[in-house]
Design a protein with these regions (language model features):
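Amphipathic alpha-helical coiled-coil/heptad-repeat segments
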Residues: 3-177
């Protein structure tokens, strides 16, 4: 009877651990997408700064706009491709809650849907003039940067909590098996 109880408990630990591993996958993929976007933000800011120069020619502006649009398109691809098990935390998702122990405790991954919203906002920005580009830097770019930084901080902390809990459960399982 005691052995049967222990086997049941070990199977329950395995089920909780599997849920944590799935959540870690979702979180790590979203974190990678947000990090990729963060890496692109420096290049996007540079293009916006170049576009805010009133002394460039129409041909130069068109080349810079094409570069800017390509960078923003890549950022949008990071949002869409940050999917694990059909879940994309960076757009159109809800928070993910997963069991963290046998006492019904949970850990959460917070949906970061504003990342997708802000990327779409900057993608739709009008940058036909130097003044437009300066406005985009002050508004849309600032918003994207804030949202991505917040997503990196939140997702990083939540994935760390999932990692710590998984390690803890592994140690408990090892001690009882």
């Amino acid at each position: 009877a005691i052995a049967q109880g222990l086997r049941g408990q070990l199977k329950a630990f395995d089920a909780v651990t599997q849920g944590l591993l799935n959540a870690k996958g979702v979180g790590n993929v979203a974190l990678a997408g947000a990090a990729g976007i963060s890496d692109l933000l420096g290049d996007i800011r540079a293009k916006l700064t170049e576009l805010s120069n009133g002394g460039i020619t129409t041909q130069q502006r068109n080349i810079l706009l094409a570069d800017f649009n390509s960078l923003v398109s890549q950022a949008a691809n990071f949002v869409v491709n940050s999917t694990f098990n059909g879940i994309t935390l960076l757009t159109g998702a809800t928070n993910i809650n997963t069991l963290s122990n046998l006492q019904s405790g949970t850990l959460s991954l917070t949906a970061q849907t504003n990342v997708g919203v802000q990327i779409r906002s900057i993608a739709g920005a009008t940058i036909g003039t130097a003044t437009n580009a300066q406005s985009v830097i002050a508004l849309q770019f600032s918003n994207v940067q804030s949202v991505v930084n917040a997503a990196l901080g939140t997702l990083g902390a939540e994935v760390r909590a999932l990692n710590l809990q998984t390690t803890f459960l592994d140690k408990i399982r090892d001690a009882t098996s």
